[in-house]
Amino acid sequence: MPKVKSGAIGRRRGRQEQRRELKSAGGLMFNTGIGQHILKNPLIINSIIDKAALRPTDVVLEVGPGTGNMTVKLLEKAKKVVACELDPRLVAELHKRVQGTPVASKLQVLVGDVLKTDLPFFDTCVANLPYQISSPFVFKLLLHRPFFRCAILMFQREFALRLVAKPGDKLYCRLSINTQLLARVDHLMKVGKNNFRPPPKVESSVVRIEPKNPPPPINFQEWDGLVRITFVRKNKTLSAAFKSSAVQQLLEKNYRIHCSVHNIIIPEDFSIADKIQQILTSTGFSDKRARSMDIDDFIRLLHGFNAEGIHFS
């Protein structure tokens, strides 16, 4: 009998695994490659809806409705549900599920990529979205106007823990502080793999996000520019983080533009490195590390730079 090469066995197993991932439900095949993991546990679905505290007058934005397990429950509670779904097959399944029911007229479906879709007005958002778009979707939500009341969102467990991490936590990062600048964030519950069909490879969590209204009086692009620099190496002192030549070139360019606009003469012996160090020292952050700094610390640091004409966007 001829030997079967290990590479061929590996490829065959890979194809078998792919086929197993495309699970069938009523003839419908789920594509895990684009994050199709349908939440099937009715207890989890009911708990998520309870956490949303819906009002009869609410317009709900649902992202990733799948086959409508949560959608039909939302339609019973809300005035209207706007469901955003990428897969036309699931859209057809969704329409079929509510067709002829008393709540059918309350459903509007937007077909397409939610990141490229102009979101309508909504009061509350509920989402079980593909985990690979978690970060851009969070910030699309938080920068959306007019403000919504709250969002109940399913995320990969580690991503959820990053959202709620505090200064000093191992998972505290740029995502943590940027989200918490714009919103109050709470971890609501853990959701195991077997509550989905097909099961994902990671554990999940449900998070509640409530935007701060009014938002802090800060230019977010400017804020993020500063935070991005400091969290590249969050365990370094800020003095070390700002010694990067790329960072210094960017800040010097921005400073020279600022001086040109405001007719400020720059001395011939000007050194951006010296100016940065002077600001870090005067604000008391020279030896601080991003991993232990909170929102108020970063606001003070940003104001310190801006007061000296240095901007990050």
Swiss-Prot record:
Chief place where the protein resides: nucleus
Keywords: Methyltransferase, Nucleus, RNA-binding, rRNA processing, S-adenosyl-L-methionine, Transferase
Matching CDD domains: AdoMet_MTases
Gene3D superfamilies in UniProt: 1.10.8.480, Vaccinia Virus protein VP39 (3.40.50.150)
InterPro entries the UniProt entry points to: KsgA/Erm, rRNA_Ade_Mease_Trfase_CS, rRNA_Ade_methylase_Trfase_N, rRNA_adenine_dimethylase, SAM-dependent_MTases_sf
GO terms, molecular function: 18S rRNA (adenine(1779)-N(6)/adenine(1780)-N(6))-dimethyltransferase activity; RNA binding; rRNA (adenine-N6,N6-)-dimethyltransferase activity
SUPFAM superfamilies linked to this entry: S-adenosyl-L-methionine-dependent methyltransferases (SSF53335)
GO biological process: positive regulation of rRNA processing; ribosomal small subunit biogenesis; rRNA methylation
Top EC category: transferase
Domain of life of the source: Eukaryota
One GO CC term, this protein: cytosol
Transmembrane regions: none
Residues the record lists as binding S-adenosyl-L-methionine: H37, L39, G64, E85, D113, N128
Region (Disordered): 1-21
EC annotation from Swiss-Prot or TrEMBL: 2.1.1.183
Catalysed reaction equations from the record: adenosine(1779)/adenosine(1780) in 18S rRNA + 4 S-adenosyl-L-methionine = N(6)-dimethyladenosine(1779)/N(6)-dimethyladenosine(1780) in 18S rRNA + 4 S-adenosyl-L-homocysteine + 4 H(+)
Compartment annotation: Nucleus, Nucleoplasm; Nucleus, Nucleolus
Family named by the database record: Belongs to the class I-like SAM-binding methyltransferase superfamily. rRNA adenine N(6)-methyltransferase family.
Chain's role: Specifically dimethylates two adjacent adenosines in the loop of a conserved hairpin near the 3'-end of 18S rRNA in the 40S particle. Involved in the pre-rRNA processing steps leading to small-subunit rRNA production independently of its RNA-modifying catalytic activity. Part of the small subunit (SSU) processome, first precursor of the small eukaryotic ribosomal subunit.
Subunit structure as annotated in this protein's UniProt entry: Part of the small subunit (SSU) processome, composed of more than 70 proteins and the RNA chaperone small nucleolar RNA (snoRNA) U3.
NCBIfam families per the UniProt record, alphabetical: ksgA
Name of the molecule in the record: Dimethyladenosine transferase
